[in-house]
Amino acid sequence: MTKIYWNINLEEMMEAGVHFGHGTRKWNPKMAPYISAKRKGIHITNLTGTARFLSEACDLVFDAASRGKQFLIVGTKNKAADSVARASIRARCHYVNKKWLGGMLTNWSTTETRLHKFRDLRMEQKMGGLNRLPKRDATILKRQLARLQTYLGGMKYMTGLPDIAIIVDQHKEYTALQECITLGIPTICLIDTNCDPNLSDISIPANDDAISSIRFILNKLVFAICEGRSSYIINP
């Protein structure tokens, strides 16, 4: 795997609040190796370890992107949704940022059918076909299209299962994580001090509640993906 310097700065991580964990009463003992201190009832994450795991994750996604692999970024809580969409669009990744529908990956045939329906409705709307239908029929189809856009809008170009999944919040996205584990899809997961570091292929100890922390981690991963994609275009 290619090793590149990703300019992961500890001071910048502190400014982004990456090191702030949950309250000391709300923690998973498996996270003990990644916690450096307690401060005012809050666990503090060891940022040196975070930087190491983030660097490993960047190496992994760079290498995968340089070989044309596909990524899915999952983060559905309100604080993460906008950052997930922006990061995914920037790196041309698929994403889910509103709600994870059970079976999105493990029942791929159903998801694929929904995606085909979504694409057909989008094309119909673009060509003005919906406006030529009776008002009642058009209203029903437009409502279906709006719902599909909400839940599948970030996956509209997916034609198969992703090669790697990036998950922003282990607790919130537990169903998505379990589906990836079931299917053997490698996962990179942001884990706060209340998470289980053993569930993902690469776990990045970090504050998964603060927008600034989520954005910092995603920006590094997305930059690595973009660099990898550039390498793939130059040397296909």
Swiss-Prot record:
Keyword annotations of the record: Chloroplast, Plastid, Ribonucleoprotein, Ribosomal protein
Predominant localisation class: plastid
Subcellular location field: Plastid, Chloroplast
GO BP annotation list: translation
Cited PROSITE patterns: RIBOSOMAL_S2_1
Gene3D superfamilies: Glucose-6-phosphate isomerase like protein, domain 1 (3.40.50.10490), Helix hairpin bin (1.10.287.610)
SUPFAM superfamilies: Ribosomal protein S2 (SSF52313)
GO MF terms, alphabetically ordered: structural constituent of ribosome
HAMAP family with a match to the protein in the record: Ribosomal_uS2_B
Entry's family note: Belongs to the universal ribosomal protein uS2 family.
The protein's name: Small ribosomal subunit protein uS2c
Naturally occurring in which organism (per UniProt): Ipomoea purpurea
